[in-house]
Amino acid sequence: MTYYHASPAGGLQVLELRKSPYFDKPTQVCLTSLRAMALFYLIRNYEYAYGYTRQGKLYFDEPFPDALKKLYAGKSGWLYTCEEGNYEKTEIPNEFVSSQPVRVLDAEYIPDAYEAFLHEQEAGNILLLDYAHFASDPEKFAKKRAWLEKAISEEIRKKAIWKAPDSDCARYYLENYPEIWEHTLEEVIFHGKPEN
C-alpha cells in the first residue's frame, strides 16, 4: 500500500510527530492511502470539508461559495510518499496514523493545489461538489446550513475565538461565514439580547 502525507513545507526526509493546532488529536503523524485525500493537507486550514459517499467515493463539499478555489488556487506544497509501516487505521476512511516518526521515500512538488484537485476529478478520484449543488436543493441546503451553524458556533465558543477578532482563525470564520459569526457573537456577548 502507498502512504501519502502532504505539507506546505518542502525538503522533509522524516515526518516527525506533530500536534494539530486546529484539531483535538494526539501528537502523531497523519497519513492517507489516497492521493486525492492527501491534497487537502497541502494547506493549513481550520476545516476540511471532505467526506465519503455511501459507495466509498471521496468528495469535497464546498461549505461556502467558491471554497475550493478560494482555499487552494495558487497554493503550493509537497506530496510525500512514505515508507510502509504498521500504521494504525482511524475511523476516517483511508486515514492512518503513526506514533513514531515516518521516513519519506519520495516527494512531489504541487505548484497549484486547485489544479491538482481538478486533475484528480478528471481521473475519477474525487467528486468536487460546488456550493450551488446543495443550494439548489432547499431541504439539503437547510440541513447543511444548520449543521454548519451548529459546528462553527460551537468552535467559536469553545475556543473563545471571538475574543481575538484579529486572529487568522477569527478572520477565516468572519470572512467565510459572516452570518454565523454575527449570530454567535450576539449570543455570546449580548446573551441573545439586542445591544443597548
For the regions a protein language model found, what residue spans apply to each?
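A general structural signal for short secondary-structure junctions and capping/turn motifs
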Residues: 21-22, 29, 68-72
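Conserved NAD+-utilizing ADP-ribose enzyme module
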Residues: 44-196
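Short, surface-exposed beta-edge/turn micro-motifs
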Residues: 1-2, 25-29, 35, 75-78
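Short, acidic Gly/Pro/Ser/Thr-rich loop/turn segments
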Residues: 11, 38, 87
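ADP-ribose/NAD+-binding catalytic cleft of ART/PARP-like enzymes
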Residues: 1-26, 41-44
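Short, well-structured hydrophobic secondary-structure segments
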Residues: 29-50
